[in-house]
A protein has these predicted regions:
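Bacterial Sec-dependent N-terminal signal peptides
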Residues: 1-28, 430-433
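Primarily a LysM-type cell-wall glycan-binding module
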Residues: 21-48
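N-terminal extracellular/periplasmic Venus flytrap/periplasmic-binding protein-like
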Residues: 60-63, 80-150
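Beta-alpha junction/loop-to-helix N-cap segments that form part of ligand/metal-binding clefts
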Residues: 109-111, 127-190
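Periplasmic-binding protein-like
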Residues: 155-164, 183-185, 225-231, 274-291, ...
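Extracytoplasmic ligand/sensor domains, especially the bilobed periplasmic-binding protein
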Residues: 160-162, 167-229, 233-243, 318-319
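Extracellular/periplasmic periplasmic-binding protein-like sensory domains
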Residues: 295-369
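Segments of small-molecule ligand-sensing domains
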Residues: 359-369, 373-432
Length: 433
């Protein structure tokens, strides 16, 4: 494992050298016992000189055996020699993301990829044969013809990617041609999922989220008086409006307030003898906290009012100092994932991540490393169940994203996981599914 940690750091370093600008990288190979540059040159149809041009740190020992687990950059082929074909007993995941791109896109893609690598390493510890191949996704202006050709020759067991919407169509076609699953990790706007059963979306489309969230909302709150408070940002208005429409269709009364409501406005909207649920349609922290503090202040003496608050996924990013307020208002945050910074499993993962890559995870929500790791767990579990289409994902100890895929009509699959994070007196919320 130590050697993997070392070479994964070199992976990023090597990508940044000027030599790579001259000889482009096509993929990354994780060495197995006994491999040499000579054997890799034969396997991938490239010259040793080309291998050394993208792996300059190996130039002093070209004939020496490569350490098991070492990541070797594989350059683009200058000939038509066939690339390495995955053995039948190997479950191979091809990751097509912009791993070398500067800025947020590259950083997030790289961290996701690293998390998936860690899941693969965990799988190997169980004696299973898995392989992760990295293919650098080109920019939107370059197209993915070379990437598609590589995938058709490699014949992976599953593909993860791409990032850019301009590449969805081509990647959808190659997944269909190979009859393998295409896991799109970031975007929810992939129209091909409606017709291609090979596609899996980690982020469900808005229409699916609306239905999933309504099912969960109605199970908990449909009999309570709903009071919607409009925020200045209104980033969650589509989902909230869907709930309101369904409630009105069922004959339920819904009250609506603007963000500058007075105490009397709020008390008039709340039902004095019935449970109430206050729903905000935004996620901007400043706006939300301003409203929640007003709600707490205005109802503090109104002991006859029973109140719960419903919020949204981005509220998870609120700092710990605000969790007490969320608990006092019986806040339920709607989400498809949950990052628990206090979890021993999460802490151990992030410590291992730092040891491997000499970097701390990006402070984002959701966490990219955990997302990649959870995706890997799902994929490798699906391998054992022999089908991504039939995989249940049960009994997997996910770090952050509970993946539960459901079929979308005659098309592909979308992540149908949905939960409420209920904040109370505890330092961590209860999960309600």
């Amino acid at each position: 494992m130590q050697c993997i940690r070392t070479i994964l750091l070199l992976f990023l370093t090597v990508f940044s050298t000027s030599l790579i600008a001259q000889t482009r990288i096509q993929s990354v190979h994780q060495a197995v016992k006994g491999e040499t540059l000579h054997s890799l040159s034969e396997k991938y149809g490239v010259t040793i000189a080309d291998l050394l041009s993208v792996n300059p740190e190996m130039s002093s020992k070209p004939n020496k055996k490569i350490k098991k687990g070492y990541l070797v950059n594989i350059p683009e082929r200058k000939t038509k020699t066939p690339v390495f074909v995955v053995p039948q007993d190997t479950f191979c995941v091809a990751v097509v993301l912009p791993l070398t791109t500067a800025g947020k896109e590259g950083e997030r893609s790289l961290e996701f990829y690293r998390g998936l690598l860690m899941a693969a390493d965990k799988e190997r510890e169980k004696g299973r044969v898995v392989k992760v191949i990295a293919i650098d996704e080109p920019g939107v202006k370059k197209g993915v013809v070379e990437v598609v050709n590589s995938l058709l020759e490699i014949k992976p067991s599953a593909i993860v990617g791409p990032l850019y919407p301009q590449h969805f169509s081509a990647m959808s076609e190659v997944a269909k041609s190979l009859n393998v699953q295409l896991i799109v990790p970031f975007s929810s706007k992939v129209k091909e999922v409606e017709t291609n059963s090979n596609i899996h979306l980690l982020n469900a489309p808005t229409a699916v989220v609306q239905e999933l969230s309504w099912t969960l909302y109605s199970a908990l709150f449909s009999k309570k008086r709903c009071v919607v408070i409009k925020t200045k940002d209104a980033t969650e208005a589509e989902v909230v409006n869907h709930w309101v429409s369904n409630l009105k269709n069922k004959g339920r009364e819904v009250k609506t307030l603007s963000s500058n409501f007075t105490q009397q406005d709020l008390l008039n909207a709340l039902h004095p003898n019935q449970s109430n649920v206050i729903v905000l349609d935004g996620s901007n922290q400043e706006n939300v906290l301003s409203i929640l503090n007003k709600v707490r202040e205005y109802t503090n003496d109104a002991t006859t009012h029973s109140i719960s608050v419903v919020g949204h996924n981005a509220w998870q990013t609120f700092s710990m100092e605000h969790h007490k307020l969320l608990g006092l208002l019986d806040t339920h945050i709607l989400s498809q994932d949950y990052y628990n910074a206090h979890s021993k499993q999460v802490i151990a993962f992030e410590e291992a991540y730092h040891q491997w890559f000499k970097h701390y995870p990006l402070q984002l929500h959701p966490r990219m490393g955990e997302l990649g790791y959870d995706t890997g767990l799902y994929l490798f579990n699906a391998q054992r169940e022999n089908s991504l289409k039939d995989a249940t994902g049960k009994d997997i100890n996910y770090l952050q994203s509970i993946l539960k895929f459901q079929k979308l009509g005659y098309g592909g699959y979308v992540n149908a996981s949905m939960m409420f994070l209920r904040f109370g007196s505890s330092s961590t919320p209860d999960i309600i599914e």
